[in-house]
Amino acid sequence: MTQSGPTGDHLVEMLAALANPLRLRIVARLATGRDYVSHLAREIGVSRPLLHMHLQRLEAAGLILGSLELSDDGKAMKYYEVAPFDLRLTATTLAEAAATLSTSDPVVKESPR
């Protein structure tokens, strides 16, 4: 059997990251184009520290990519964009992913909402 999707551990991490409504909104917004933290926070209507926490979680799951860039006035700005991914869940892909789990009961580190 050839593994075509993410490993079990990566799938758990991706799905856990997307299980939060705010993180799902962030990915949906970034799917329309890259953006920097301050603008994204204003657009979504959350504080920068809260947004940053969620961006870190999405980046750790491999769903978004962040890059530091200099603005015209020399200010460092972190831009985020959606990472290329294609997630299709079927019984077969779930079975393949489950077979690669590093433990029978993975613990997902989640901050309280």
Regions found by a protein language model. Give the residues of each.
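Long, low-complexity, charged/polar intrinsically disordered regions in eukaryotic proteins
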Residues: 1-7
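N-terminal helix-turn-helix DNA-binding core of bacterial DNA-binding proteins
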Residues: 10-47, 72, 76-81
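Alpha-helical residues within the helix-turn-helix
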Residues: 42, 59-60
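Residues within the DNA-recognition helix of helix-turn-helix
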Residues: 54
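Beta-hairpin "wing" of winged helix-turn-helix
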Residues: 61-73
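Conserved segment of winged-helix/HTH DNA-binding domains
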Residues: 72-113
